[in-house]
């Protein structure tokens, strides 16, 4: 019974805590400072009709002279008796009705009175709820009035004997007084209307205790998981199973800084509970010749129970089903005691330790109707069928006076192994099922009885349900000794003799007429308690799930009710992603991790960085029986699995203060509490070389959210074949239970692979041998893990090694000299001479490039038997490297030269595009014409200038150009004396401009190599009537005309009697070293090539204006020609202005997609095309009539129609891209 604590308790507690008093010793007769005749400690002037407290009601001995005299004479027993005789009690209703006074005479109430020496008062302990005498320790009484319990505190009973601190005191039921006073009309406090007064009168003083309205305190539930990350949950009123949330209560009836509260959680679900039961045993009972009952279900034949591995073994399969099912609504209640702390300056108590699925007892309650159907035969026999769950039990009675019973034991079937002492596996005929035995075992006894009373036939049915107490080791060992079903059932029945819960109900039906059907239903609660693993059962029975609601109520230690509201169950599903996306390029350097992140609100059970079970410490198993929960990593070499493991759950964020506010009854407080984790789990993956596959883990705690680091070691030669698969399994059993079929209780697999990257050998394109020591490097992203690479001779190669790992080998060094290849034997002696360094160093932190000055060019010449390094001038140094990771062999080369300023062969020729067509004479005659179109490639060259590169000069200047052809010569030169650029043609002055405007060459990415056009030329586009456009030399913003383009270059042609020879010009150029001012001369050419102007395409298909040469374009869409649709329409355009007539020549072949053989008909058809405006951007739609090449008179098989452009009948094709347009599937029909 909870006791009401008042201000005295608080004061004494504070005084003793502060050390102001060392004990609580009260002198006889002098301790009571309260001179009221009647009073209470703590003060109670009203109670609600639902109050559950004990009221300490004091009657002052000094207020009654007779009582006082007895107390002074130490006759405490007589003082009690005289006091009781002087007390009257009555009940006054709100209407004013007053019941007659009753006396608390010593005859009836003496054993309830006590003399408290310290208070010099007689005290009654009024219990507001008890219906009969209740007791409490004197220790508890002393605490309730605010004193420190001790043996020196004196309390006497009506026999004048001392009541020691460890002895019991009788509590007077207030219900007894109410019943006596109202002559039985009201029998307890709860039955009295609000406003009723309970009046105690003594020594002329009346003490009134009013019946007040029921007080219901207000409270609220807050979910810090939502506060920490609102994206994690659908709303504030959702909670993940097993997690803690914050509870706040407004309670102005208590004043202690901390206080216990008792909360009741009621779980309900919109979905029906679905419970599968396994029948572990069954038996029957009969008397007076009744037949043995039969059932549609039965247990398999028992063989043995093994407690050591929690297994029940059956010898064979049952002949009938052993599984029953309950499908109906079920409510569940659980209780949770939580200590709340008072927030300063308010009446609000809070705690962050309210668990939404506490580990304590869960009471499951549903409705089970057992239907009985009977029939009384005319011969006086009867049958009775009981339907329970989805099974039936059949009774047969040959005559009245017979009775039979069917008893069976059920255990729930669960999807997972619940562990020893919580679950057992049943095995029969190869079938294996997990069950809740021995924790949840329910027995049902169904009894049928057939009797006759007078002329009435009576069919009677009863149902007895009992839940066995969780079986202990003694009972389990007894069950283990059973050798057959009879012994096993007997042991179970004996264990059911003192059940955890039990219920009984019966029904009956009577008739006087034989041949009559009878029916009745026995309603049962199907109520059982789960003492351990309650969360597992909540989920398994479909209570905690997506449609579950939890209503929370409570009481403080006064018994005052609290309304807290409700919340919804939330089953969270994990997610997982990585950055960067696969495939990866390279190993891991320093903190350049492959980042991954798991998000799972269902992982909140583990709320500390050490992953202790902070939320639900009594849960069996670290992850709520989800032993495979956590991060999984599997490593494959190709398709072969080489390593797989569960790395376990990930470390949660360190808890940090989270502040929010709550307002209750107008009071607002800021709540600061340690947050639940945000359920975001960063994972960093590192990939490093190893001699074998292995995985290590560690945690980085330098951030608020710890980072889990997973390092995967891989043999270098297998990296590209390695596949790493990762996934995360939620530890929440609800996620597994509801989503195991879809697999969403775990994340989708994240697969990491590695890209095949070929390393690059970094060597100068050109190296002057005079510098003697040539640089060398390797660029490979898979090397970023290293800071340097050692190189040295090993078995005929130059081995590259880091930390004992061979990353690659230089397999050959060859020199191409004077057309001959000479290889260097990579012996240790030769390598020691050739290499001037034993290490390649990374150019910067985590760089894929490793370089050093490596090759001794003088030693190279010596190894080749050359007199000196200059003898290597013009040779190429080839180096071949074998990369262990990719397996690739890569080669690069360097041109070795003596000088530092020269033209690199080969140079790039310039090129002018010409359009080949024909000038129209008549329909069958024309003259070929080439029309200048454009310069498509400027004459260009590469020049090596080491001096300019060393001086960081990015451009070198062309100082002179001479273009020489058979018909003309153009000279462009820079005159430094007057700083001007001058142009001559055939020795004659043409133009002059200030500055050097010829051209400049820009440095490429290769050291010392400069590239660009040596002169910039422009050719105007000609026409059919004036085909030779003017050529210009471009000098800055100036264009200088130097005659027509055909003076310098011509593509040439040969058609019929017409022939034109091609023309090419030589281009000589001079460049100057800006450092030494030395000049050098090089040569290239200016050439030409032919193009054709017309572009063709099927109607609706776009025509590219410029494109690479294409001979055929195949149009495979079927075309059907008929007398009403006789045309094939195509699109035609030209890349130049072409205001001249030309023809679309059409040839037809029999068959689908046939372009060879004999055309049908034998002669081609021609369609004239003419538009004065035809040119770039102008598209003509040209219809070609079909009767010219396909007969429409009779249905035909498919034809292939080929079209191309010609300047006249029999002329050359002048269409390009395509040259031939092919309609591959053309059919003609007659109508």
UniProtKB/Swiss-Prot annotation:
UniProt keyword Chloroplast, yes or no: no
Keywords: Cell wall, S-layer, Secreted, Signal
Induction (record text): Constitutively expressed.
Subcellular localization, as worded in the UniProt entry: Secreted, Cell wall, S-layer
Keyword field contains Nucleotide-binding: no
Family, as annotated: Belongs to the Sulfolobales SlaA family.
Name of the protein described by the UniProt record: S-layer protein A
Organism in which the protein naturally occurs: Saccharolobus solfataricus (strain ATCC 35092 / DSM 1617 / JCM 11322 / P2)
Gene: slaA
